[in-house]
A protein has these predicted regions:
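Active-site-adjacent betaalpha module
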Residues: 1-26, 57-65, 89-213
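Short, basic, glycine/proline-bearing loop/turn elements
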Residues: 1-4, 41-44, 85-87
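A short alpha/beta connector and helix-capping loop motif
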Residues: 23, 41-73
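Acidic-leg catalytic submotif of subtilisin-like serine proteases
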Residues: 26-36
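Short, flexible active-site-adjacent loop segments at beta-strand->alpha-helix junctions, enriched
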Residues: 31-33, 75-76, 117, 144
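Short, basic/glycine-rich phosphate-binding loops at helix/coil junctions
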Residues: 35-37, 77-84, 102-112
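Early exported N-terminus immediately downstream of N-terminal targeting peptides
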Residues: 68-69, 74-88
Length: 213
């Protein structure tokens, strides 16, 4: 007769859960603080609003587990602004993306990086911040999956980070674009694209975050 512990482990495996160690992991929210103010943004606004609920839940679970959250954000051409002004701009009711930005707005405990281009790594302090935090695994989420999320994933892969990209926490202009981006991340970049509800944060006994030399 199988022991009860073995049965429980088998049940969890059959449920398709993905264990994610707390130590060495960071949650990255890419361009979720976003005014979404461009021609033809209506469909993306709708998709982003649907994405906000599972992403907010994932962030809550990550924070409770002790996983740091880093906002990677465009400055929308406001070169004299800081992140606080960017948030204020995006949560204003005049912004098409204000519902998403309000639901996913950062807290005082979160980190943020402003990016000048598509990738969160290009000409930013992200790599240095991740190294300082001892991060070797990144959970990539946000807007748009086929552009900024994918560009960031490419750069993360080239820097030997393990990639998670929960499919329900990433949106693009079209479903086809999003599916293509997720396939690229899953197949080419060897990332895990399971839905966020399958990610299970756990603390390994005696584990320590590994820093690169």
């Amino acid at each position: 007769m199988a022991r009860s512990g073995t049965h429980k482990r088998t049940t969890r495996a059959n449920a398709g859960e993905t264990p994610v160690p707390v130590a060495g992991t960071a949650l990255l929210l890419i361009d979720v603080v976003n005014d979404l103010a461009f021609d033809g943004s209506g469909p993306l606004v709708t998709q982003a609003e649907a994405m906000a609920a599972p992403l907010a839940q994932l962030k809550r679970r990550a924070t409770t587990a002790g996983v740091p959250t880093i906002y990677i954000n465009d400055n929308f051409g406001q070169w004299r602004s800081d992140f606080r002004r960017t948030v204020a701009h995006c949560i204003a009711r005049s912004s098409p993306g204000h519902r998403v930005s309000r639901r996913l707005r950062p807290t005082a405990h979160d980190y943020f990086v402003l990016k000048p281009k598509h990738s969160g790594f290009f000409d930013t302090t992200l790599d240095t911040l991740l190294e300082t935090l001892g991060v070797r695994r990144v959970i990539l989420t946000g807007i748009a999956g086929n552009i900024c999320v994918l560009f960031t994933a490419n750069d993360a892969y080239m820097r030997d980070y393990k990639i998670f990209a929960p499919a329900d926490c990433i949106v693009s202009n079209t479903a086809t674009d999003n599916d293509h981006a997720l396939r690229q991340i899953g197949v080419v970049l060897r990332g895990n694209v399971a839905p966020s509800e399958r990610l299970r944060f756990h603390a390994s006994r005696g584990s320590k975050a590994v820093r690169r030399r």
